[in-house]
UniProtKB/Swiss-Prot annotation:
One GO CC term, this protein: cytoplasm
Taxonomic source organism: Saccharomyces cerevisiae (strain VIN 13) (Baker's yeast)
Name of the featured protein: Mitochondrial morphogenesis protein SLD7
Entry keyword annotation includes Nucleus: yes
Predominant subcellular localization, coarse grouping: nucleus
Oligomeric form and interacting partners: Interacts with SLD3.
Length: 257
């Protein structure tokens, strides 16, 4: 039997100020010890691609909660932002912490078919990884401290291995940068083509290619600062919403009769 666990309200911060998404009810099919319902407060962090989340984010025995809301604002928000089935919304809970690390706790809200669900990010495996890495670093430090002149060949081998790792890291970094730029180009192209179709502009129309190209070039110029930072290895990405807004603005300008 389903039981209401709590109600979640979280804040969206934007250029026009803050908007609070209210009355998100979390329900569970699993029995719980507590009979009362609580109210959680949170802050929107970012959107994520569920298919690209690390394996440690979700454990096999974790709870998934069903989400409901009677708020028209909340319903419209989720309908707009979760059109893509792989997209998730990350919420940092303001008044709840991870029991092991005492770090903030996080919820990820997502859509599964027509249902709205969420789960709490499981940090247990991450902490285990962090502990193993710390232990390994300590062991390496002790080994280096005990190396004598007779062990100089080991140092040479280790330095050679580190150089190889550094080269691989650099190659990986370049591949990652290229992937981000390719993703930007693909998303931008799809948005432009979709915008042209919505306006009834067929590729058989004269200057179709010219209109596509000037829109593409203008969008690149608009986001030149973000693209420059990406080319320098930044982890940030040009958000889908920002790129969509840019394309819509440009097409309105270029197709104005």
């Amino acid at each position: 039997m389903s039981r209401k666990l709590c109600t979640l309200n979280f804040t969206l911060s934007g250029k026009q100020g803050s908007l609070v998404i209210r009355d998100i009810q979390l329900w569970s099919n699993r029995p719980t010890a507590s009979k009362s319902t609580s109210e959680l407060r949170g802050q929107f962090i970012q959107y994520v691609d569920l298919a690209k989340l690390p394996l440690w984010v979700r454990s096999t025995n974790m709870n998934t909660y069903r989400c409901y809301s009677t708020s028209a604002t909340a319903q419209a928000y989720f309908k707009s932002k979760l059109r893509n089935a792989n997209r998730g919304i990350v919420i940092e809970l303001s008044d709840k912490v991870d029991q092991r690390s005492q770090e903030p706790a996080y919820l990820i809200i997502f859509r599964e078919n027509t249902e709205l669900n969420c789960f709490q990010v499981d940090l247990t495996m991450k902490h285990e990884f962090d502990g193993q890495v710390t232990k390994l670093k300590q062991e390496i430090g002790k080994t280096r401290a005990s190396v004598s002149k007779e062990g100089s060949i080991d140092i040479i081998i280790q330095q050679s291995q580190q150089r190889k790792i550094g080269t691989k890291t650099k190659v990986y970094r370049n591949v990652h940068i290229n992937d981000k730029r390719l993703q930007f180009n693909e998303t931008l192209s799809k948005l432009i083509l979709g915008g042209l179709r919505l306006r009834g502009i067929s590729n058989s129309i004269t200057d179709y290619q010219k209109l596509y190209k000037i829109t593409f070039d203008a969008a690149e110029f608009t986001h030149r600062d973000e693209l420059k930072r990406i080319s320098m290895g930044s982890v940030e990405e040009v958000s889908f919403e920002s790129l969509q807004e840019t394309v819509e603005t440009l097409l309105k300008l270029f197709t104005k009769s």
